[in-house]
From Swiss-Prot:
<keyword id="KW-0378">Hydrolase</keyword>
<dbReference type="Pfam" id="PF07501">
    <property type="entry name" value="G5"/>
</dbReference>
<comment type="similarity">
    <text>Belongs to the glycosyl hydrolase 20 family.</text>
</comment>
<feature type="compositionally biased region" description="Basic and acidic residues">
    <location>
        <begin position="1277"/>
        <end position="1286"/>
    </location>
</feature>
<feature type="region of interest" description="Catalytic domain 2">
    <location>
        <begin position="621"/>
        <end position="1046"/>
    </location>
</feature>
<dbReference type="InterPro" id="IPR052764">
    <property type="entry name" value="GH20_Enzymes"/>
</dbReference>
<keyword id="KW-0572">Peptidoglycan-anchor</keyword>
<feature type="domain" description="G5 2">
    <location>
        <begin position="1150"/>
        <end position="1230"/>
    </location>
</feature>
<dbReference type="InterPro" id="IPR015883">
    <property type="entry name" value="Glyco_hydro_20_cat"/>
</dbReference>
<dbReference type="GO" id="GO:0005576">
    <property type="term" value="C:extracellular region"/>
</dbReference>
<feature type="signal peptide">
    <location>
        <begin position="1"/>
        <end position="33"/>
    </location>
</feature>
<feature type="propeptide" description="Removed by sortase">
    <location>
        <begin position="1285"/>
        <end position="1312"/>
    </location>
</feature>
<keyword id="KW-0134">Cell wall</keyword>
<dbReference type="InterPro" id="IPR019931">
    <property type="entry name" value="LPXTG_anchor"/>
</dbReference>
<dbReference type="Pfam" id="PF00746">
    <property type="entry name" value="Gram_pos_anchor"/>
</dbReference>
<protein>
    <recommendedName>
        <fullName>Beta-N-acetylhexosaminidase</fullName>
        <ecNumber>3.2.1.52</ecNumber>
    </recommendedName>
</protein>
<feature type="compositionally biased region" description="Polar residues">
    <location>
        <begin position="38"/>
        <end position="59"/>
    </location>
</feature>
Amino acid sequence: MKHEKQQRFSIRKYAVGAASVLIGFAFQAQTVAADGVTPTTTENQPTIHTVSDSPQSSENRTEETPKAVLQPEAPKTVETETPATDKVASLPKTEEKPQEEVSSTPSDKAEVVTPTSAEKETANKKAEEASPKKEEAKEVDSKESNTDKTDKDKPAKKDEAKAEADKPATEAGKERAATVNEKLAKKKIVSIDAGRKYFSPEQLKEIIDKAKHYGYTDLHLLVGNDGLRFMLDDMSITANGKTYASDDVKRAIEKGTNDYYNDPNGNHLTESQMTDLINYAKDKGIGLIPTVNSPGHMDAILNAMKELGIQNPNFSYFGKKSARTVDLDNEQAVAFTKALIDKYAAYFAKKTEIFNIGLDEYANDATDAKGWSVLQADKYYPNEGYPVKGYEKFIAYANDLARIVKSHGLKPMAFNDGIYYNSDTSFGSFDKDIIVSMWTGGWGGYDVASSKLLAEKGHQILNTNDAWYYVLGRNADGQGWYNLDQGLNGIKNTPITSVPKTEGADIPIIGGMVAAWADTPSARYSPSRLFKLMRHFANANAEYFAADYESAEQALNEVPKDLNRYTAESVTAVKEAEKAIRSLDSNLSRAQQDTIDQAIAKLQETVNNLTLTPEAQKEEEAKREVEKLAKNKVISIDAGRKYFTLNQLKRIVDKASELGYSDVHLLLGNDGLRFLLDDMTITANGKTYASDDVKKAIIEGTKAYYDDPNGTALTQAEVTELIEYAKSKDIGLIPAINSPGHMDAMLVAMEKLGIKNPQAHFDKVSKTTMDLKNEEAMNFVKALIGKYMDFFAGKTKIFNFGTDEYANDATSAQGWYYLKWYQLYGKFAEYANTLAAMAKERGLQPMAFNDGFYYEDKDDVQFDKDVLISYWSKGWWGYNLASPQYLASKGYKFLNTNGDWYYILGQKPEDGGGFLKKAIENTGKTPFNQLASTKYPEVDLPTVGSMLSIWADRPSAEYKEEEIFELMTAFADHNKDYFRANYNALREELAKIPTNLEGYSKESLEALDAAKTALNYNLNRNKQAELDTLVANLKAALQGLKPAVTHSGSLDENEVAANVETRPELITRTEEIPFEVIKKENPNLPAGQENIITAGVKGERTHYISVLTENGKTTETVLDSQVTKEVINQVVEVGAPVTHKGDESGLAPTTEVKPRLDIQEEEIPFTTVTCENPLLLKGKTQVITKGVNGHRSNFYSVSTSADGKEVKTLVNSVVAQEAVTQIVEVGTMVTHVGDENGQAAIAEEKPKLEIPSQPAPSTAPAEESKVLPQDPAPVVTEKKLPETGTHDSAGLVVAGLMSTLAAYGLTKRKED
């Protein structure tokens, strides 16, 4: 074979001038025949099914002009299009006859059919046959003979008017109805490339739901297309005289698919999943059309065949092997493929109607998109090395597959490009029963048969015009061929009836198919973009799509079932509106959707106007009261930054219970990590980190963040006790371990455990946030959080995994923007979804803060919909978080964590937002259900409750219990209808009821029973008095319990009195423990003035008393006494200034010896971090940041004891200056031969991200022209929300910013 002969053949093509190209695109119509325009190829213009193939030329544009009658094709080279008027004049006049009036819409014109004599013969032949498919074809032909003709046959306007006037009104109405029904009967299909890319059953069901909603009839599912992503339970294949075992075939196909693309979301659908999917679609009235493509697009099957021992199954063209196409000369490979198709067809038999066998793009990857020409070449260039009788073998192969499919009662379908390629019918005939999915009219050098020829050959046509194509990931103009904008424009300009390459004829179609392809299977699937494509296609062809009746059905279902609760007048209006919906025409199209929508709106209006009867009104109010009480009322405590003792947390639980809260949200991991399990062994990265090592590392990490003098971490025993204690008070506990931000302690711990560089690094190294590219760090953190989830599983209901404020300290609060810029946002979504899945696997409800979810209201990635969103902020300038409305549209529910209610310990008004007074004010101003950035009730989104938050951004700030209780009380008092009344007294009384009620009088038991029955457990704080009355009644009934009378009268002389067992009763009695008042003199206060330093709180002692009643005499015995509430002594400062020297006798007063204050300075040693520098000579080091020791001031009270010794007591410890970490670079560059690698290391250059002062564009530029992001740095406002992760000591920078803002009269809110 000579190379030049290959070249001679490969360049065989025709072209027309540039003017024709421009005209073709301008008119958006097909202007040339098969030997048409050769477009300029660009690298971003792949084919329909394959990235590497050539794009469509102008000849692919479909026709919207009037069409000629189907005639035998006359020889021609180039067909040009003239204006419509000229074309009408030049059309053949073989069938002119008076015509009835036709619609002038493009869709109606396209529906016109003019059969040829060949078609009539086909119709007559089909009329004699009995198969349902052929009956359908007969009906089509009949329709062709009686429906509207082309524009050339229209009579003049006056003749049209006369003809219309002569027709009876009923006849005209029937014809219009028949036209509507014909259009609605067409198939409207959405195609999903589930062969290249894995789609989960849930995703496919969502697509089916949308298809139903928009009026589609079918889902076309390519399960075999390059990849093979559907596996039967039994995959045993018998071919070539042997049987390939099922498990062997499964393993081979799974490997073959993974070799094509190893999709992280899954490999394939199972048989049970497919069966469920088909049934689900059937219930929705949607058919399913499966595709297993061959002989091309078989990458996975070819790889599988090689795994199973079939040699050389791939087609080869002059030494270049096709990765996707089977060699039709390889009998073993062909036999195996046919057996496989037979296996799948047998499964789909009686489940579906149509089976697509593919047949497109033969070996385009090995022949430069000349596969069909190569197969036909031997006939015209014999003995030159082309496949002998290649095209004849392809026809035989296609017909064999059609026969296999039909043997299972299915209709075969195939793509058009290989059928009668180059309009050459001399090689043989294709089975006429193959439905042709007409997707392309070809392009320069890709000369497919016209749809006219295919129709003449008796094939039904499914219009799959590639003008409507969308390739996943190509979401806008400039992102490659078949991008979404291109598809939407194609839909706008190309109606469903515009078939590719008609050559001027009207082509009857069975329907239209819009397609989404996965040429790049790693590209993200965006449901909203697919649904946009589907919606536009339905709207553009509204007359063909059924109207949405589901919304009407839903509106009917939402009518209250019990209408007896409403007034007769309002019920009558509802019934009339219901009747109007039920009487709607059942064959309305999407174009008539307004008729349905108006009826629905009327029904909804009448339902909203239903008026309750007085009795029902009371019931409804009671129901609403219960619904409000069912909302979560949560108090959040930042126990990750600051250490809280078990006793402090119990007292918070007590107060929460008293006020009617439902839960305590405990951030145990938030910058610091202040909860350690007994066993902290972590297995990750192929190794096990010992428990003691992990504990030590976490403690050191937490202390490095803040060494709290009150303690470092809660133990497992303490947290277990806290959970049980809260449970006894009807309080739930919601744990939070925050990541990948707010991980200061964990990051230090990982480094100490040998995990290098776990921190994110942008403008600088983040102290708070993990690097999502560091797989070792990610694996460790997931294992650690999984450990905590294991502990809380079964003990709590919700687990918060955080995910807020990514690397705000290293990006000027632009972390999410940076993630998107560096294309790491998908990694974040994957990480968040993994944590959500881990929580669900353990029976926990996953929760997260809202920051990172769908940043900027964009669905660039997909997040787990089951996550409960703790919504605290819409963001601020430059921090564009998703709106609550957008998240609600994604199906999320919220725990309202409105930042208006935030209090940061120690915060003062001059510090910014988050101070106590403002938080207390906002509990009265911001409604319970009002989410940040919205107004309630105008915006009423689905919330499960609300959360009040206490933050410890400055962990050294003093915790004052009374402040927290004041804020908790204010929140409860301003939302009394949501907060449960104080049931503590009721719990105590219920605990007093004897477990054994035998021996008490019937009357007293009945009174007790009545008191218990009257109890209402759904009273809110507005009805505390009602509850107190119920408790008093129960208490009185308990006190009224009396022993039953066992006999009456006197005993007989022989009668023995019955033995009555007298049992003691256990009661509890509480007494108050008064607090002491401790007075301390303060020389700085005026004489006689007092100042309460610590408010006194009375304690409580509970006595457990045994009460024994015998012969009417009651004896009480105290069994035990316990202090159940500790006393807090009141500390009061009393003014006692010294105003003079000497008293009236001239003597100086004797002063009380008071303790003195001793301040001692302590040095805090700096830590050293070592980083490798590939640009520095090996063995050399250089200090990048010089370490500076910090200073801690310790305040001691020094007093003298009675024996004269000094007693020193630590009063407080304050870090006066933080230590500065020393960063040292160690060189790794080798400059000589003979090192371990034999050459010098090559330094990796990383882009430095800088944020200039000017605003950044709203969307990032294309990759090839990428510049550094220019988002503005955030400014600071007076409403400073908690720094949930930023400790920035750059005082000069802050001062400079504030000075600049002061010049504009601005202040900035910094919400962390």
